[in-house]
Each structure stands twice: as structure tokens, then as C-alpha cells.
Amino acid sequence: MMRNYNFYTYILTNYNRKVLYTGVTNELEKRLHEHYFGLYSIDGKESFTTKYKCYYLVWYERHQYIQHAIEREKELKAG
């Protein structure tokens, strides 16, 4: 059974708009803050968004179900 919440698929870019990052979250504002301040890393390694300075939100889409948000992220990444 899928749970009914607000989920977001989003795209960030860097200042020069040369790099794109696509992600999914249930708290868009909080997640953007985490990207901007580099608060999310894996095993102490610099995150992709920190490394490439992807701090600019260029697009987002709200979804009612997490599975729909994940499917949309996969579509976007596939091109």
C-alpha cells in the first residue's frame, strides 16, 4: 500500500548551468538547505552537489506518492 504524502522530484544546477543534479525528497526546502550547506555526505566524502556546487533549483514537481516521485526521477535521468 502506497502512503499518501507530498514528495518532490527536483533538479538543481550550478552557477554556470553546466551540471545537473536530480533528486527526490519529501521536504524540499529542508533538502535544498542540506545541499547548500553540504550537510549530506556519504562516508564523510564530499557529496555530488557540494563537489559541483549545484545549489540552484531550476525545476521541481510535486507527487502524492513516493513511488511516483522515484519513477519520475528515473525518467529524467534516463533522458
Mark where each language-model region is.
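GIY-YIG nuclease catalytic motif and its immediate N-terminal context
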Residues: 1-40, 50-62, 68-74
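Basic, flexible Lys/Arg- and Gly-enriched helix-loop patches that mediate nucleic-acid binding at interfaces
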Residues: 46
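Short, intrinsically disordered, charge-balanced linker/junction segments flanking boundaries
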Residues: 76-79
